[in-house]
Amino acid sequence: MKIIKRNGSEVDFDLNKIVVAVTKANAACEKQELTASQIQEIAEYVEFKTVKANRALSVEEIQDIVEDQIMAQGAFEVARRYVRYRYTRSLIRKANTTDNQILSLIECNNEEVKQENSNKNPTVNSVQRDYMAGEVSKDITKRILLPQDIVEAHEAGIIHFHDSDYFAQHMHNCDLVNLEDMLQNGTVISGTMIEKPHSFSTACNIATQIIAQVASSQYGGQSISLAHLAPFVQISREKIRASVQKEAEAFGATADQEQINKIAEERLRDEIRRGVQTIQYQVVTLLTTNGQAPFVTVFMYLGEAKNAQEKADLAMIIEETLRQRIQGVKNEKGVWITPAFPKLIYVLEEDNIHEGAPYWYLTELAAKCTAKRMVPDYISEKKMLEYKVDKNGEGHCYTCMGCRSFLTPYIDPKTNKPKYYGRFNQGVVTLNLVDIACSSGGDMDKFWKIFDERLELCYRALMCRHNRLKGTLSDAAPILWQYGALARLEKGEKIDKLLYGGYSTISLGYAGLYECTRYMTGKSHTDDEGGGKAFALSVMQHLNDACNKWKKQENIDFSIYGTPLESTTYKFAKCLQKRFGIIKGVTDKNYITNSYHVHVSEPIDAFTKLKFESEFQRLSPGGAISYVEVPNMQQNIPAVLQVMQYIYDNIMYAELNTKSDYCQCCGFDGEIKIVENADGKLIWQCPNCGNTDQDKMNVARRTCGYIGTQYWNQGRTQEIKDRVLHL
């Protein structure tokens, strides 16, 4: 049985320490109020509660239980002494708030840091440097930069102020990189002028350099479009044709144009293969200044091509990208595995969704890729054109920024044309809906009152995000603000104009709609007749109404965002259990449900789930993604295609979750299971050989839109274990 110390490290529970602490407090009293047997009884009760919690309790939680039990024994003077001791120790700890945290993460015994980010390896020096900087930033943020009530709400799990480890700096969240502008008009990387590339392979190489630079200048994800690389295929084609012509002439051969074109196309395909491979391998092997591979999404949308030739060339790039992802990348043992990045998004459209359509072959390839490697994810052009309508009444299809954060439609006042690439998100604050419900005690009037109070708190927290960016000079990140990734501002110019008028967005996240509804109505939000669904939709509308009010008030694009709780799901769950105890169906798990999702354990088929969630996705304009959990589908591609066609007709953005694991000890290639060890901790175990060494297995799971490969905290691991199949 483990407990979590204040520095995040995990240690064995020691009953004797409780006995010693209470005995000292008792001895300090003039009249000892507790007998040795009473002290032993207190310690044993704490041990019982710790076991019953079915998770590692924190030292603070254990001390709270000790206090309660001393009071229950009527030993009030002992309780006062114990509280005074805690307070004195707390003051000593606050004298330096970061030393223990930093030292524990350097020595790799900080359990919370180990499992905080499923794509960061905390044993690597570069990651540790990022975490060290993050601890300092979090400390400054808590003590100086944020109002105390926002800090307290964050620590209590009432809200989550995202990425406080980067808040000390003037950094934004995520964006759509304007790769087209940078490649066509040139850019500057690390003080070096980069001109328009003269081949597809060079364009791919430059793109990876841009990705790395952008990732090092922000804390969130980024997206690029393959359509911005497509024009360079024709440039390479013409170069290769000229080269083949020269070779023929040098040998005195007479080659007709058809032969030259055939040879050129073969060489061109080889260049496309090498270019795509450059992007894949550079992305997974690059380490940015925040200690991880860039969180990058590659967008594959035929509709972005400007002409027929460019569309055909884009199709070749998409085909090669899918083929290489199906193959995967080799791990250190030389075995092909599923890489986490880049994330791929494939747009379903009339030209590729029906059998017999011109690009149906790409959709079949995408289905095979999803069945084996969990990507691509799918955007329905049909539904997105319905959802994302600008002020002129025109619908648009575009990618999300990284995982799921979507921009709002925007017309550039300079050109009177829609603009998406070069825009960004300022940051996120997430509201814990479950806490609002539990705080209300089930009283509807009280619920809406507390809801409004919490929304006001979120508004002020979001304005802290906004104001932190306000006044930022373009010099803070030249690749972003001066050299085309997001803008081409002058040196020394402030970025303020990009923060207003809809150019960028700022996101109000939400989590736990299922548990909130369950507590307030006694029903799941999938329950149409019992009032669950109607209540859940009214909560969503209330969130949107708040954002619309703030938008008019501030001229800033506030939007609702279905938060991908990665490690925070565990934190929220622990905070809820601490504040409200174990409530069946509400706080009895070590996680809470992401955004509007159907609870992971609720039986529901794939099509019903997607149809149901589509209503809620539409009410999350700032971003959201739905998923269906499926078994190994590699031998049932027609079923995958059927789900994809359903996505096209019914929901804007969705993904299929499969399993893709490998045991390095025995070579097992299948699903590595989650089991409970002797301490009650969830661990990963090979079903073939029993291997439990995480360093000797490759596990890839969908964490929250992205694929995670570095394991997860106990809350998220339990959530993964509880997932039921939908197909």
Q: In which residue ranges do the predicted regions lie?
A:
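Long insertion/accessory domains within large nucleic-acid-processing enzymes
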Residues: 688-727
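Charged, amphipathic alpha-helical regulatory modules used
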Residues: 1-109, 721-726
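Conserved catalytic cores of very large enzyme subunits
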Residues: 88-92, 98-502, 523, 529-692, ...
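Metallocofactor- and cofactor-centric catalytic cores in central/energy metabolism, strongly enriched
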Residues: 272-276, 280, 519, 716-722
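Short amphipathic alpha-helical segments with coiled-coil-like heptad repeat character
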Residues: 15-19, 74-77, 306-314, 521-526, ...
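Short, solvent-exposed positions on alpha-helices
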Residues: 37, 57-60, 504, 530, ...
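Contiguous, well-ordered alpha-helical segments that form the cores/surfaces of helical PPI scaffolds
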Residues: 231, 300, 506-519, 541, ...
